[in-house]
Amino acid sequence: MAAKAAALSSSPFVSSRRLSSPAASLRARTPRCVMGSEQVRVVVEEEGKTKKRMGVAEPRSAPPAVWTPRAPAQEARLAALRTDGRDSRLKIFSGTANRPLAQEIASYLGVDLGKVLIKRFADGEIYVQLQESVRGCDVFLVQPTCSPVNENLMELFVMIDACRRASARSITVVIPYFGYARADRKAQGREAITAKLSANLLTEAGSDRVIVCDIHSTQALGYFDIPVDHIHGQPVILDYLASKTISKDLVVVSPDVGGVVRARAFAKKLSDAPLAIVDKRRQGHNMSEVMHLIGDVKGKVAIMVDDMIDTAGTITSAAALLKQEGAEAVYACSTHAVFSPPAIERLSGGIFEEVIVTNSILLPEHKCFPQLTVLSMANLVAETIWHVHRDGSVSSIFQ
């Protein structure tokens, strides 16, 4: 790990701060937030007139950096992908939810991002037309179903149908963040299981395969009647942490009992670090209460691991408890930055040394703050797509 850290420390995107100095005061720095270099154009047709509406924030003259791992072995694999990736049967299209990620994935594979026209009519209906042939092609549709969830999900359904009617050989939906994944069971009577419904609708629309990243509950993978490849964002976060000088006094913390398996796997890969658990009781939707700590964090650097950060109530309450129990510094690591209000206020309040997320969800500028670091998962998704396209093993990517 030391050799890897030395090799990666020269990257201009790597923070100069070290985990071995947790007591250092929080310094203001430019947030490493994802912003698209290209805008997603959504056309609204109203009374015969065409108006333009931008689906993402305006790009800035100097977009903040997104840290991408540069391990030599990984670079060799990606070089092979770029060399062999000029396969006319491989087509990658993007919806409006996260075009910058889709563009980066296509660039890694050495292919052009597919041309597609996506329009919104005056009454809100969605129109999709593919601008190139997909007959006999393996089509991959990149679309996280993040906020606005229903809008992005419906747009994905329409894109799937357009590809199916255009005689695509296979249709794989790439969903970096799977909305409704938390509605995976009936907690009370007369409730819907929306995760299962979403899986059914994706199948009925015409999907042949699904690629998802760090779905909230792995049992939801069984809701699909088609093949599902479940990939993990942990390697991206672990590579970033490996680029820093890791303190020996390190502890991985699960912010709730439900995330223990995830945190234990993370701790094992992080030099077999000790594990601590925050026990809490949830009082209602988007509300939680931290009860007590299981484990020792006194004088240690705490790395909190979760699959997503929504309102940040759970993770900030847990971080406050860790501070009370004597943790020198607290880092938050999560694959999905949902960031529903009041998450930004909670996360930027100074309790976290750093908040580390991936670009599975496109973050607008108003959701960026000084402690935020965004890591790119494009290379991980690109390798997965290539293995699926070539009928290779996806699990081998994570070994």
Curated annotation (Swiss-Prot):
Database matches in InterPro entries: PRib_PP_synth_CS (IPR000842), Pribosyltran_N (IPR029099), PRibTrfase_dom (IPR000836), PRTase-like (IPR029057), Rib-P_diPkinase (IPR005946), Rib-P_diPkinase_bac (IPR037515)
Q: Which UniProt keywords apply?
A: ATP-binding, Chloroplast, Kinase, Magnesium, Metal-binding, Nucleotide biosynthesis, Nucleotide-binding, Plastid, Transferase, Transit peptide
Q: What class of enzyme is it?
A: transferase
Give the catalytic activity.
D-ribose 5-phosphate + ATP = 5-phospho-alpha-D-ribose 1-diphosphate + AMP + H(+)
Q: Which GO terms describe its cellular component?
A: chloroplast; cytoplasm; ribose phosphate diphosphokinase complex
Q: What is this protein called?
A: Ribose-phosphate pyrophosphokinase 2, chloroplastic
What remark does the entry make about the cofactor? Binds 1 Mg(2+) ion per subunit.
Note the NCBIfam families from the entry: PRK01259.1, PRK02812.1, ribP_PPkin
Do you know which CDD domains this protein is assigned to?
A: PRTases_typeI
The record's Pfam families line, in alphabetical order, gives: Pribosyl_synth, Pribosyltran_N
Q: What is the lineage of its organism?
A: Eukaryota, Viridiplantae, Streptophyta, Embryophyta, Tracheophyta
Record-listed Mg(2+) binding positions: D214, H216, D225, D229
Q: Which family does it belong to?
A: Belongs to the ribose-phosphate pyrophosphokinase family.
Transit peptide span? 1-32
Q: Which organism is it from?
A: Oryza sativa subsp. japonica (Rice)
Q: List required co-factors.
A: Mg(2+)
The protein's Enzyme Commission number? 2.7.6.1
Q: Which molecular-function annotation in GO is an example for this chain?
A: kinase activity
Q: Where in the cell is it found?
A: Plastid, Chloroplast
A Gene Ontology BP annotation from the UniProt entry: ribonucleoside monophosphate biosynthetic process
- State if S-adenosyl-L-methionine is listed as a keyword: no
Region: Binding of phosphoribosylpyrophosphate; residue ranges are 299-314
